[in-house]
């Protein structure tokens, strides 16, 4: 391929809306162009990268017995109503009507429609296990699309669904996909970490995310060092060992204290001369299961995902001032669990161990001192409710946890019978008994993987593509295209590399050498072959993008040397 014939519209200025490295570089290097908020056109270079990522994915899915299909993007609302997710998904679901007034959606996931498909064609245990996958456009009406390909409204995903006879079969399928995902991301040249994760609206009992470690990642991952136990989890799912009081105290009599205008933990600590770990925060929420109060220590934050799971709520949001006053009789800042009626109490397990703590008194300008859980308020639901932070003790071994930011590029789920039971997907076992099919779901964000690779592989000059997914492995750059010797040797280098099966681009544009060198670094070809003054001696210069190492080689050694570098 010749650069003079290829669409690589590099930019000299970075668009103002580009916030993260991948967004800036993919725009500047001519990989993508914005069509609308969260919607991008993928230009030829990006399409080449995507094809390579998809080839790796297909090879690994096929190796495990996966069969590729293509499901419809537009899905009838009837299926989503049957599964119960039509209303759960909320405003993120693109909804539309056809000319007859029938409701449809643009699929953000495909659990319902693939369950319906298998229902029609799988009847017997002899047809199981079954692995079906697709690589397909997905749609999600993000409230705030941002970061280019990392959080868009239209994106490409691979999703595979497993169908098994029982939980033992699901465990085999889950392990196969888990290991296949590790190979996919390793082959793509990414540094990643599998972590425990919450299942979210897709549901199921067990889930893991595959996180590409990058400072720009939206997700926070906590993990135990690998020389310890290796525990790792998304912060939404992460647990830690509950901290118990360091000194033993006897419970004291409950005492009401005036705290005029002291609404925040910081205000109360300063006024009473105590630390935040002696205070219990009581935070009210409105949910579809009724009002609830989350209780955490004053130096902790509520993990709302854990809270939602603990009470089995579909929706929850923090109560507003009017609701707080109606439920407690007090303004914001003075809520507490003592005497709080008609509200379900969900207590973090650290709070359950506290003695003689301080809480709001459910009356204006007042707090209680010497509150003791179980004595002064009921321990209705006790669970790990806090948001885990760095240096909390690991739940498995007790070592201090580390934290890093990551980009989720894949997630695997044990769905169990969540969809098969509500939608009626069953099979007949060897005794003729009807049983629900046990399902798993396994997704990879293809466009997100492309962007994550850039986030992890770049420098001040531009992208540094891992060789396996680079748009071209080699760029040949003649310094002076008007020099007949240089042009002839560049053509020869291009020809011998192409004939050897190396993906190579010849930059034959009549540009200054500096422009072509900058573009080569910006686009991120793993290897640059420069044809300059040494062309008269039949020599070319090889330069590795990732470290700048260079070497002069003769044209006869070029193919073997390039293969060695790559």
UniProtKB/Swiss-Prot annotation:
It is an enzyme of class 6 (ligase). It holds the Pfam family tRNA-synt_2b. GO terms for cellular component: cytosol. Its EC number is 6.1.1.15. The keyword Nucleotide-binding applies. It catalyses: tRNA(Pro) + L-proline + ATP = L-prolyl-tRNA(Pro) + AMP + diphosphate. Homodimer. Catalyzes the attachment of proline to tRNA(Pro) in a two-step reaction: proline is first activated by ATP to form Pro-AMP and then transferred to the acceptor end of tRNA(Pro). As ProRS can inadvertently accommodate and process non-cognate amino acids such as alanine and cysteine, to avoid such errors it has two additional distinct editing activities against alanine. One activity is designated as 'pretransfer' editing and involves the tRNA(Pro)-independent hydrolysis of activated Ala-AMP. Consists of three domains: the N-terminal catalytic domain, the editing domain and the C-terminal anticodon-binding domain. NCBIfam families: PRK09194.1, proS_fam_II. This is Proline--tRNA ligase. It comes from Desulforudis audaxviator (strain MP104C). The gene is proS.
């Amino acid at each position: 391929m010749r650069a003079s014939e290829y669409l690589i519209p590099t930019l000299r200025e970075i668009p103002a809306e580009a916030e993260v490295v991948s967004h800036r570089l993919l725009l500047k290097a001519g990989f993508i162009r914005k069509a609308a908020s969260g919607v991008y056109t993928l230009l030829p270079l990006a399409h080449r990268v995507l094809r390579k990522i998809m080839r790796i994915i297909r090879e690994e899915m096929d190796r495990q017995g996966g069969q590729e299909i293509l499901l419809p993007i537009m899905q009838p609302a009837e299926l989503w109503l049957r599964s119960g997710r039509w209303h759960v998904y909320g405003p993120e679901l693109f909804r539309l009507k056809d000319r007859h007034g029938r409701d449809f959606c643009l699929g953000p996931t495909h659990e319902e429609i693939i369950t319906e498909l298998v229902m029609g064609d799988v009847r017997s245990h002899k047809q199981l296990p079954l692995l079906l996958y697709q690589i397909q456009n997905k749609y999600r009406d993000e409230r705030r699309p941002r970061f280019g390909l990392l959080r868009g409204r239209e994106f490409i995903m691979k999703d595979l669904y497993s169908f098994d006879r029982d939980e033992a079969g699901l465990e085999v399928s889950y392990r196969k996909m888990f290991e296949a995902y590790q190979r996919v991301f390793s082959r793509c040249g990414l540094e990643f970490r599998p972590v425990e994760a919450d299942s979210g609206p897709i549901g199921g009992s067990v889930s893991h995310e595959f996180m590409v470690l990058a400072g720009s990642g939206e997700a926070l991952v906590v993990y135990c060092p690998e020389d310890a136990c290796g525990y790792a989890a998304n912060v939404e799912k992460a647990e830690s060992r509950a901290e118990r009081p360091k000194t033993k105290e006897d419970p004291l009599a409950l005492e009401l204290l005036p705290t005029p205008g002291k609404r925040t933990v910081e205000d109360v600590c300063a006024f009473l001369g105590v630390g935040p770990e002696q205070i219990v925060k009581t935070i009210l929420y409105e949910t579809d299961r009724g009002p609830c109060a989350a209780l955490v220590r004053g130096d902790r934050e509520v993990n709302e995902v854990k809270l939602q799971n603990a009470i089995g709520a579909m929706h929850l949001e923090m109560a507003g001032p009017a609701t707080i006053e109606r439920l407690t009789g007090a303004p914001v800042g003075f809520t507490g669990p003592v005497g709080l009626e008609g509200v379900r109490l969900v207590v973090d397990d650290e709070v359950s161990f506290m003695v003689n703590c301080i809480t709001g008194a459910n009356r204006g300008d007042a707090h209680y001192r010497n509150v003791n859980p179980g004595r002064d308020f009921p321990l209705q639901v006790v669970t790990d409710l806090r948001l885990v932070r760095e240096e909390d003790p690991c739940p498995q071994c007790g070592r201090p946890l580390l934290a890093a930011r990551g980009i989720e590029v894949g997630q695997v789920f044990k769905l169990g019978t969540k969809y098969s039971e509500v939608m009626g997907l069953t099979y007949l076992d060897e005794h003729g008994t009807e049983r629900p099919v046990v399902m798993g779901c396994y997704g990879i964000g293809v466009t997100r993987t492309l962007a994550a690779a850039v986030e992890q592989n770049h420098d001040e000059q531009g992208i540094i593509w891992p060789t396996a997914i680079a748009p071209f492995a080699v760029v040949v750059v003649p310094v002076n295209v008007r020099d007949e010797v240089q042009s002839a040797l560049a053509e020869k280098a291009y020809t011998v590399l192409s004939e050897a099966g190396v993906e190579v681009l010849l930059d034959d544009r009549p540009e200054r050498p500096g422009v072509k060198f900058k573009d080569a670094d910006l686009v991120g070809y793993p290897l640059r072959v420069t044809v300059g003054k040494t062309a008269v001696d039949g020599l070319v210069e090889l330069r590795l993008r990732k470290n700048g190492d260079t070497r002069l080689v003769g044209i006869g050694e070029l193919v073997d040397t390039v293969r060695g570098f790559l």
